[in-house]
Structure formats: structure tokens, C-alpha cells
Amino acid sequence: MRTLVTGAAGFIGSTLVDRLLADGHGVVGLDDLSSGRAENLHSAENSDKFEFVKADIVDADLTGLLAEFKPEVIFHLAAQISVKRSVDDPPFDATVNVVGTVRLAEAARLAGVRKVVHTSSGGSVYGTPPAYPTSEDMPVNPASPYAAGKVAGEVYLNMYRNLYDLDCSHIAPANVYGPRQDPHGEAGVVAIFSEALLAGRTTKIFGDGSDTRDYVFVDDVVDAFVRAGGPAGGGQRFNVGTGVETSTRELHTAIAGAVGAPDEPEFHPPRLGDLRRSRLDNTRAREVLGWQPQVALAEGIAKTVEFFRNKSQ
């Protein structure tokens, strides 16, 4: 199968590229390298089934690109990923995450693409939900332009499915972590803690550490993307999480243990807009896609710490 991965040089995108190549698929990777890193694709570049195109989905000739490469399935991970930037500059966020998605959908329609697997956000589209674990049947309640853009992307792609028969599915990951995650961004607390503790730097927890998140390992998320690229789940959003809540304080303790560093974070006032809880119901992904998480948190943390330890040497 011939595939296109947008955001291919990112943390999740590059891991997906490696998985698709390992499964024997041809992959065209598209990324403008504004946040993704070329080094994430070093392994992929050794494959004769991989081609890389440096381009921005907002202004690239997507119609020409898709006509040339003729992918059967598009995995759409290219995005503006900073919630803070979306709040500071909503038009920019919408340009990338909404207009970019619509441009891709239109090019896919014209090229006869079978399916687009779109990246939504299990951690933000529900806002503060009325129940935990949170299922896809809960109303969306975006609390940021970033979340609103993800919902808009879903709506547009579902419209393309209904009007033009361009199939789509939406992967809504919980808090993804693992090797290649950016330790310098606003999110990615596992990477942030891992790198800081390995370097002997002080770590910060915002709030009292009781906030919880649903942490899911990147390989498990990639498996959900691959499964969603098949015929099942058209037009549906799939929560991809473990269904297990872990507090920030518990997470820090686990990472400090894996590193062999003191478990002594600094505590700072909570940040405006941070959610108190997050826990996703993954029943739909289990039942429709046959997906289930395979990597427990302790194992995933060990793999992540090993990655950053090797990188620092």
C-alpha cells in the first residue's frame, strides 16, 4: 500500500513512518521541519520505499503532490501543536490546523485517495467533561483555539466523507510519550522530566502534583493509526488512551526511579487553563479497530529514559 504521512518528521509521525515501512508499505513523508526534526527520519531514509518532501501543507501544491505519488491512505499528523500559541494567535492556528486540513482533503478528493486518518486530540476536545473515563459520545467542548481547530478538522473531513465519499477516521490520543518526544516544548512532560533528571537539573511541577493524565506510549498510538487506515471506523473518532489515570507527582517519582535521580521536584503555581483530570474511554477503539494498549507505563518510561540517556552520551 502507498501512503502519505504529513508531519512525518515529528515525534509520532516519524514513529508511524518507521512502522509503515516495517510493514512493507511505501511511504511519502511530508514535513516543513518547523517543529519536526530531520534526524527522526534517519532510519526511514535508508529504505528505498521512503521519499521525503519538505513542504508546508498551508501553501504546498498538494494537488500536484498527490497526483504524482498517488497514495491510497493519508495519515494527517501535520499541525500547529502549541496550545499557548493558539491562544496568542488564533488565526495562525486556524490557518494550519483548519485550512491546512481542508486543503489536504480537497487534494485527496481530486487524487482519488481512499482514506484520510486525521489526528484529533483526546486531551483537549472534551474540555472538562462531565464523566470519566471520557467516551467519544461526550459533547465536545473546546477550551482553546487549538482544540477548536481539531474539532473543525473532524467536521470538515466528515463532510468530505458524506459529500464526496472520501473516507476518514479521527485518532484522538491521550497524553502520548516515548522516544523522540520534544523535551523543550510546553507539553511532553515525560520527555521534559527524563531529560532534566538525566542532566541533574531541577524539575518543576505546576500545582500540587495531583493533576492526572492518561499516558499512552507512542508505539501503541501508532498501532491505532495503522488500524484506522483500514476499512473500519469510517467517520468515527477513536479515543486512544490506556484508561488509567496517573498523577504528575506519581509520574515524577516513576521517572526519577528509572533515571536513578532524587525525587525532589519544585512546586510552582498551577498554569492557567491546565486540566485537572484526563482519562479516556478506549472501548470504541477496542471494539471497532481491535486495538488495545500493549505498553505499561513503567515499561514505556524505561524505554523513554533509555532513549534520552543514549542521546545525551
UniProtKB/Swiss-Prot annotation:
Pathway: Carbohydrate metabolism; galactose metabolism. Transmembrane segments: none annotated. Its cofactor is NAD(+). Keywords: Carbohydrate metabolism, Galactose metabolism, Isomerase, NAD. InterPro entries: NAD(P)-bd_dom (IPR016040), NAD(P)-bd_dom_sf (IPR036291). Substrate binds at S121, Y146, N175, V189, V190, K204, I205, F206, R213, R271, L272, G273, D274. The keyword NADP does not apply. The keyword Nuclease does not apply. GO terms for molecular function: UDP-glucose 4-epimerase activity. NAD(+) binds at residues 11-12, 31-36, 56-57, 77-81, 146, 150. It catalyses: UDP-alpha-D-glucose = UDP-alpha-D-galactose. Its EC number is 5.1.3.2. One of its GO terms (biological process) is galactose metabolic process. The active site is at Y146 (proton acceptor). Belongs to the NAD(P)-dependent epimerase/dehydratase family. Involved in the metabolism of galactose. Catalyzes the conversion of UDP-galactose (UDP-Gal) to UDP-glucose (UDP-Glc) through a mechanism involving the transient reduction of NAD. Homodimer. This is UDP-glucose 4-epimerase. It comes from Mycolicibacterium smegmatis (strain ATCC 700084 / mc(2)155) (Mycobacterium smegmatis).
